[in-house]
Amino acid sequence: MTHYILLIIGTALINNFVLVKFLGLCPFMGVSKKIETAVGMGLATMFVLTVASLCAYLVDHYILIPLNATFLRTLVFILVIAVVVQFTEMAINKTSPTLYRLLGIFLPLITTNCAVLGVALLNVNLAHNLTESVVYGFGASLGFSLVLVLFAALRERLVAADIPATFRGSAIALITAGLMSLAFMGFTGLVK
């Protein structure tokens, strides 16, 4: 049990996919203008990443490896992720049409979110078993959601701040993301 807790902490805080591995930057910058949207995107990505990790493991170990078709991993994982995203999109549209409209184009873009594909491929490269794959996907999604919501809160505060004209918009957002990355570097060495 301790191994799984350390895997979640390590994936969410120490090896964060956005701030350390630079995966998932498109939704990180695009959806982080309002906290409500960031929370919705974080929850949707959390569900997709966890389920996609499970499905990718099952497809890889029960279809691709027995058929000696591991060279198709990237393509097959993209298809698996697309199916999971479509399922998530239909569920959100049915349960919360307002959130569905708020997320807009970013919900289908989870399919092309490199963090989701990165987690699936890293699970294979790190030779995780089924439980570790799901926990790794959950930890990665937890870290993604945490960073997304924190960054959205910072960006909402930046709107009211007196920022020089040359730094407004994307410039101050990137500087803030860099400072946030430095803050997360403080977690390095937390887990041995």
Swiss-Prot record:
Its source organism is: Haemophilus influenzae (strain PittEE)
According to its record, how does it sit in the membrane?
A: Multi-pass membrane protein
Pfam families recorded: Rnf-Nqr (PF02508)
Function noted in UniProt: Part of a membrane-bound complex that couples electron transfer with translocation of ions across the membrane.
Give the quaternary structure.
The complex is composed of six subunits: RnfA, RnfB, RnfC, RnfD, RnfE and RnfG.
**What is the official name of this protein in its record?**
Ion-translocating oxidoreductase complex subunit A
Q: Where are the transmembrane segments?
A: 5-25, 39-59, 63-83, 102-122, 134-154, 171-191
Q: Where in the cell is it found?
A: Cell inner membrane
Keywords on record: Cell inner membrane, Cell membrane, Electron transport, Membrane, Translocase, Transmembrane, Transmembrane helix, Transport
